[in-house]
């Protein structure tokens, strides 16, 4: 119900509702990924900032943090005996600029992560939105060997990845 014509015209009420709908898929994807992390009996951390990772495991992530200027928060972090894995998850029901920008951003993170010893960036994404951004996804896939989707999780990728 629209309670204020001015807010509707300026997008306040519509925007808030739309943002909630847009984020719903992302939260559902996070929940799904978490269920597979639990199923694989992995020790993991949720919503961990880059600085928290640096402090907890005494690792220098300046190559990823733009020399300490980034405040990146990862959806999940898995720490094994030999590696720190940072995980980003998302699900896109439709295409658009957000999806393209995310792909470009994650491609850059993948390239930067290669400069950090015993550190891997993992991206788990899915959804029909990728049909319209196939080229962007392919470009990222070419530099990120840890790019997965829901089918990969169903096929137990975590037991192979987190050794």
For each feature predicted by the language model, list its residue ranges.
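A short acidic/basic microdomain associated with nuclease active sites
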Residues: 39-68
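Glycine-centered loop/turn motif at secondary-structure junctions
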Residues: 41-43, 117, 144
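Domain-level recognition of nuclease-like catalytic cores that cleave nucleotide substrates
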Residues: 122-163
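Short, well-structured alpha-helical interface segments that form or flank functional binding sites
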Residues: 24, 28-32, 71, 101-108, ...
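Catalytic cores of nucleic-acid endonucleases
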Residues: 90-135, 139
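Interdomain/boundary linker segments immediately adjacent to catalytic/signaling cores
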Residues: 1-41
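Active-site beta-strand-loop-beta-strand hairpin of nuclease catalytic cores
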Residues: 69-86
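Short loop/turn segments at strand-loop or loop-helix junctions that form parts
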Residues: 9-11, 81, 87-92, 126
């Amino acid at each position: 119900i629209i309670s204020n014509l001015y807010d509707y015209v300026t997008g306040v009420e519509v925007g808030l509702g739309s943002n909630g709908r847009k984020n719903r898929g992302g939260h559902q994807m996070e929940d799904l990924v978490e269920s597979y992390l639990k199923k694989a009996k992995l020790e993991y951390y949720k919503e961990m900032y880059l600085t928290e990772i640096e402090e907890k495991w005494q690792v220098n992530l300046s190559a990823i943090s733009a020399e300490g200027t980034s405040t990146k928060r990862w959806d999940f972090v898995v720490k094994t005996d030999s590696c720190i894995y940072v995980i980003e998850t998302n699900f896109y029901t439709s295409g658009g600029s957000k999806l393209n920008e995310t792909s470009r951003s994650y491609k850059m993170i993948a390239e930067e992560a290669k400069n950090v010893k015993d550190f891997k960036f993992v991206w788990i994404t899915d959804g029909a939105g990728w049909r319209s951004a196939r080229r962007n996804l392919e470009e990222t896939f070419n530099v990120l060997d840890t790019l997965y989707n829901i089918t990969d999780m169903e096929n137990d990728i975590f037991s192979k990845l987190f050794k």
